[in-house]
From Swiss-Prot:
A GO biological-process term: maturation of SSU-rRNA
Organism: Rhodopseudomonas palustris (strain TIE-1)
PROSITE patterns: RBFA (PS01319)
Keyword Acetylation attached: no
Classification via SUPFAM superfamilies: Ribosome-binding factor A, RbfA (SSF89919)
InterPro entries according to UniProt: KH_dom-like_a/b, RbfA, RbfA_dom_sf, Ribosome-bd_factorA_CS
Quaternary structure annotation from Swiss-Prot or TrEMBL: Monomer. Binds 30S ribosomal subunits, but not 50S ribosomal subunits or 70S ribosomes.
Keywords per UniProt: Cytoplasm, Ribosome biogenesis
Listed GO CC annotations: cytosol
The family this protein is said to belong to: Belongs to the RbfA family.
UniProt xrefs under Pfam families: RBFA
KW Cytoplasm (keyword) present: yes
Localization terms from the record: Cytoplasm
Name of the protein in its database record: Ribosome-binding factor A
Length: 137
């Protein structure tokens, strides 16, 4: 018996893990936006959830967060870690999965990286290279 041709999965994981990650992202963002976690740090910060990455077996969710303004990142991560069990239970109620995934919280570094690249592109050395050269006419 020959094996069936396997479909190639999209970059970043299988379609199912991407879909589950997006459902969890929406659930966490909704919980935080509605003030579902009673914590002074989380209540005093607007926290965005730009991405959730799932392990292939869907048992681990790495949740990338960013406090608006980029301040108190460590405090926000610590508060989320402290309320991890509550959030896991809420996610289990909102997302229909066989197992509620273990949660890990990380700061989303993409905003800082984009700002660094933007600053680099605006630097005088790069601007000089981008100016049209008048002696090539």
């Amino acid at each position: 018996m020959s094996r069936q041709h396997q479909k190639s999965s999209p970059p970043g994981g299988s379609t199912r893990s991407l879909r589950v990650g997006e459902l969890i992202r929406h659930a966490v963002a909704e919980i935080l936006a509605q003030g579902g976690v009673h914590d002074p740090v989380l209540e005093s910060h607007l926290v965005t959830v730009p991405e959730v990455r799932m392990s292939p077996d869907l048992k681990l969710a790495t949740i990338y967060v960013m406090p608006l303004g980029g301040r108190d990142e460590k405090l926000v991560i610590d508060a989320l870690e402290h309320h991890k069990r509550f959030l896991r239970g809420e996610i289990a109620h909102r997302v229909n999965l066989k197992f509620a995934p273990e949660l890990r919280f990380r700061i989303d570094e993409r905003f800082a990286e984009a700002e660094r690249i933007d600053k680099l592109l605006r630097s005088p050395a790069v601007q000089k290279d981008l100016e049209p050269n008048s002696d090539q006419d």
